[in-house]
Amino acid sequence: FGRRIGAKEEEAFFIGDGAGKPTGIFNATGGAETGVTAANTTITFDDVMDLYYSLRAPYRNKAVWLLNDSTVKAIRKLKDGNGNYIWQPSVREGEPDRILNRPYRTSIYVPELAAGKRVMAFGDYSYYWIAERQGRSFKRLNELYATTGQVGFLASERVDGKLILSEAVKTLDVKAAGK
């Protein structure tokens, strides 16, 4: 139950539209502010650097990158003018890689690289507030599956979430096709 509830919460907190669910960080209305708009679906290192500096310095101290695995892959493939990869893996054992010396987290619910999408966020997520409106409840459903000899369970929870200070998190948006 915990994994499924956690996955649904993660999805809502990242891409929820605020209608009967939390307002997600990547929602264009009520979510994070746009920091940078990439010209196309090929992200450049300049785009990443511009996103970093679009976030005000006080928020950078606790900032974390949030992106999809496909975006991490695109960033890892970036090369300098001499053909060397810009991404440098961690040199300390047990310490994860970083982007511009800040940690990153991936989620399947962060939109993938595509035109018109917000594909990456950078910021201090302590300004995303989560409220539990009611505790988790579990119900055993004996009768529903009695004819097949099975027992069902129903879990429910009511939560809400919203970025209360939109300037604390910035996104990298990809320009919509044809614009």
Which residues make up each language-model segment?
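Structured, hydrophobic secondary-structure cores that serve as assembly/anchoring elements
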Residues: F1-K179
